């Protein structure tokens, strides 16, 4: 028994000396495994307390099998299923597939059906009320139709705002007008663009017919009195004999002052005038 105890104490002293010697390298995880397997009399807990890590690291990539050139043997790398993000990624992909499957197709916008009313036991669709256009609106629409049979969106919006109509009403009027124009053209009747829309247009109202703007005559103007030409002789004026006395007398006789002087003087004025001249 004494020999066994001395052997054990000597082996312990050798291990302690080799562990504390400054010339030897520090023990690693492989050394721990070596001591834990071969040192049967000591528990691994004594060696774990002296290490910086509480437990040995489980290496998936052993250093002696790792090769930078990718020449490591099979089984060196763990399969992709063991990656921590693999499961969540696959779950997300499954979620996307299920979400796309659950998504409903886009529904097509359907126009509302017209209202149906029972008349005499039979269903009858109620038509929308016809648009009543005024004579001014019809004249403006017809005038614009003469310029262009098709309107762009800005032009249609501007015309509707000017006439107080909606863009739909303007569009429908132009559609009806084009169809009627084509129908008359096919029948060989070239429609005159200058005719009044009140008598020919089916969309016209029942107001009394008014002349179109483009056909209306300008208001009659009051004729200005023209100066009557003075009577003159057939011979030119420069051929007449110039008589200064006659010309001056004629001119003087035509003035209002001459008319007053030609009036007869009242009685007694002659003596007064004679006295004035005598005093002077």
Curated annotation (Swiss-Prot):
Annotated DNA-binding ranges? 126-185
Q: Where is this region: Disordered?
A: 1-38, 189-252
Name the domain of life: Eukaryota
Please name the CDD domains in this protein's record: homeodomain
GO molecular function annotations of the record: DNA-binding transcription factor activity, RNA polymerase II-specific; RNA polymerase II cis-regulatory region sequence-specific DNA binding
Keywords, sorted A to Z? Developmental protein, DNA-binding, Homeobox, Nucleus
* Compositional bias ranges of the Polar residues kind: 20-30, 199-208
Q: Where does this one sit in the cell?
A: Nucleus
Which SMART domains does this chain map to?
HOX
Composition bias type Low complexity, residue spans: 1-13
Coiled-coil stretches: none
| Record GO cellular component, one term | nucleus
BP GO annotations: epithelial cell differentiation
| Family as reported in the entry's similarity comment | Belongs to the distal-less homeobox family.
**Name of the protein described by the UniProt record:** Homeobox protein DLX-3
The uppermost taxa in this organism's lineage are: Eukaryota, Metazoa, Chordata, Craniata, Vertebrata
């Amino acid at each position: 028994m004494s020999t066994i105890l001395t052997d054990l104490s000597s082996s312990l002293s050798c291990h302690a000396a080799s562990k504390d010697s400054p010339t030897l390298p520090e023990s690693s995880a492989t050394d721990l495994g070596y001591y834990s397997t071969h040192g049967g009399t000591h528990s691994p807990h004594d060696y774990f307390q002296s290490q910086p890590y509480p437990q040995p690291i489980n290496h998936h990539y052993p250093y002696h099998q790792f090769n930078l050139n990718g020449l490591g043997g099979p089984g060196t790398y763990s399969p992709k299923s063991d990656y921590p993000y693999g499961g969540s990624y696959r779950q997300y992909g499954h979620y996307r597939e299920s979400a796309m499957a659950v998504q409903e197709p886009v529904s097509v916008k359907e126009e509302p059906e017209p209202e149906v009313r029972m008349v005499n036991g039979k269903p009858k669709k109620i038509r929308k009320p016809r648009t009543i256009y005024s004579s001014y609106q019809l004249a403006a629409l017809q005038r614009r139709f003469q310029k262009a049979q098709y309107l762009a969106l800005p032009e249609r919006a501007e015309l509707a705002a000017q006439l107080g109509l909606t863009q739909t009403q303007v569009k429908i009027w132009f559609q009806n007008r084009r169809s009627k124009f084509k129908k008359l053209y096919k029948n060989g009747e070239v429609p005159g663009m200058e005719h009044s829309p009140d008598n020919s247009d089916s969309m016209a109202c029942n107001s009394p017919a008014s002349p179109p703007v483009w056909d209306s005559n300008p208001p009659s103007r009051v004729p200005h009195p023209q100066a009557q030409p003075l009577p003159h002789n057939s011979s030119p004026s420069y051929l007449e004999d110039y008589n200064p006395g006659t010309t001056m007398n004629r001119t003087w006789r035509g003035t209002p002052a001459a008319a007053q002087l030609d009036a007869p003087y009242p009685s007694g004025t002659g003596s007064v005038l004679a006295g004035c001249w005598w005093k002077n």
